[in-house]
Amino acid sequence: MSYILSEEEQMLRDSAQAFLTEKSPVSELRRLRDEGCKDGFRHAIWKEMGEMGWNGVVIPEEYGGVDMGYTAAGIILQEMGRTLAATPFLASSVLCATALRYGGTDGQKSEHLPKIATGEKIYALAVDEKARHNAKHIETRATKDGNGFRLSGQKRFVVCGNGADMLIVAARMDDESIGLFLVDPEADGIERTLRRSVDSHAPANINFDDVKLDGDALLSETEDGSALLDLVLDSGRACLAAEQLGLAEEAFSRTLDYIKERDQFGQKIGSFQGLQHRAAHLLTEVEMTQSLVVKALRQLDEAPSQAPLWIAAAKAKATKVSRLSSSEAIQMHGGVGMTDEYEIGFFYKRAQAAGEYLGDDAWGTSRVAELSGF
C-alpha cells in the first residue's frame, strides 16, 4: 500500500514481506497441494505468526492482542496475496476475532480471544449454505432446548473448517433472527468433509445433526445477530480485498518482468505496442484498486458506520482486477503460462476462489447500488 504508513505500520509491512517471502513463498503452496495437506496450511508457520503478534492485530491488548486495527490486518494480507500464503489468518484472526470482539460476552472474550491471538487455537466462521455467497440465506436452525440449543443444518465451503479447533456458526433461531454460536467441531452430531478448492486450499463442508449446545454458546444474547454478522463479514471483505490487491500487484509485476526479458522476432516482447497498452491498462486498474482498498480499511478503523459502501466497492473492484491481472498474466506469458511448472497459474486459481468468497464483483456492485439508495 502506497499511502503514508505510520512507523509501526511500515515495520509491520517490512516484517510481513520478509517473513512470507522466506517461509511461505508460492512454492510452499505447491508443496501443500502435492502433499495433499488436510488442513491446507503449515501449523509451524502459523505458530510463528502468533509469536510475532500478527494473529492479534484486531484483538484488544487486554485479551493478548496488539490492537493495531484492520489496516494492519490488510497490510499483512496484502503481503500474503503476493506470496499466496495459505494460512488461517483471515478466518481466525479477522473474521472470528471480530465476531468475538464485538459480539462476545466478557467471559467469551476472556476465554477465546487470547487463544486466537497466540495461535494456540484456530477458529473458523461457518455461514454459507449454497454454492454462492448469500449471508441472508441461512436455513441452519438453532432451536431452544432448555437452557441451551439444538443445532441442525449444513454449511458449505467453510474456509479452514477442516483444521479448525472451534467454529462460529451462523444459525436461525426460533424467532427467525440470526445468532452466532460457538461450536466445538468434535461434538457429537458434527461431520466434517474435506473439500479441495481450485486454489489448492482445503475448505470443509460441515453437517450439524441435532448438535447439543450450552446456553453460553450464543454470542451475546443482547446483540442484533444480523448486524453483528454484517460487521464480521465486512471486516473479512475489506481484508480479503487487500489480499486480492497483493495478488494482482504480484501477478502484474511478474508479467512485466517477463515481457521485458522474453525475446520474440529478434526483440523483447515488451516492445510490442499491443502488450504495452495492456500493461498500462493493468497498472491503472491496480492503482485504482489500491485506492479503494486503502479507503475501505481506513474507514473500518476510523468511521465504521460509513465503511460498508467502501468495503463493497473495494471487494467488487479487487475481485474484478485480481482476475483480470492473473488472466492477462497467463495470456502475456504465452504457452508457458498454462503449464504447472510456472507459478503464474497459481495466481489465476487463487483469484477465482478469493473472488467468490464473501461475495463476488456482481454481489459487490449490487451492494453498492443498494447502499446508495438505488
Where are these regions (language model features)?
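A short, Trp-centered hydrophobic/proline-enriched beta-strand micro-motif
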Residues: 119-130
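A generic local secondary-structure boundary/capping motif
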Residues: 112-114, 130-131, 139-141, 155-159, ...
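Cytochrome P450 C-terminal beta-domain/meander region
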Residues: 134-152
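A short core secondary-structure module
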Residues: 152-191
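Flexible, small-/acidic-enriched active-site or ligand-binding loops
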Residues: 137-139, 157-158, 184-221
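N-terminal glycine-rich flavin-associated loop
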Residues: 85-107
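Short glycine/proline-enriched turns and hinge-like loops at secondary-structure junctions
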Residues: 68-70, 134-137, 160-164
